[in-house]
């Protein structure tokens, strides 16, 4: 019986302290979500910048590959034209 009364007393104290805490919230606890929002925005901005940099690097690599392919195609076409002209000259 004494143990159960002690337990009931603990529960009453617990709920009483919870009620006081809810009625008077800690100002620092309220400031934490507000401080976390700029971090999320800066993280999103950093991720966007990294994505843009990656996309720019991929575009530059693609352009360089296309330029190499175009130069190779032009060289092959010139060689084929020269071979055709030489064969036509031989008759």
UniProtKB/Swiss-Prot annotation:
Keywords: Antifreeze protein, Repeat, Secreted, Signal
Cystine bridges: none
Keyword Chloroplast found: no
Main subcellular localisation: secreted
Tissue: Detected in blood serum (at protein level).
Propeptide: 22-39
GO molecular function: antifreeze activity
InterPro entries: Antifreeze_1
Subcellular location: Secreted
One Gene Ontology cellular component: extracellular region
Signal peptide interval: 1-21
Role summary: Contributes to protect fish blood from freezing at subzero sea water temperatures. Lowers the blood freezing point. Binds to nascent ice crystals and prevents further growth.
Family designation: Belongs to the type-I AFP family.
Protein name as catalogued: Ice-structuring protein 2A7
Species the sequence originates in: Pseudopleuronectes americanus (Winter flounder)
The organism's taxonomic lineage, starting at the top: Eukaryota, Metazoa, Chordata, Craniata, Vertebrata
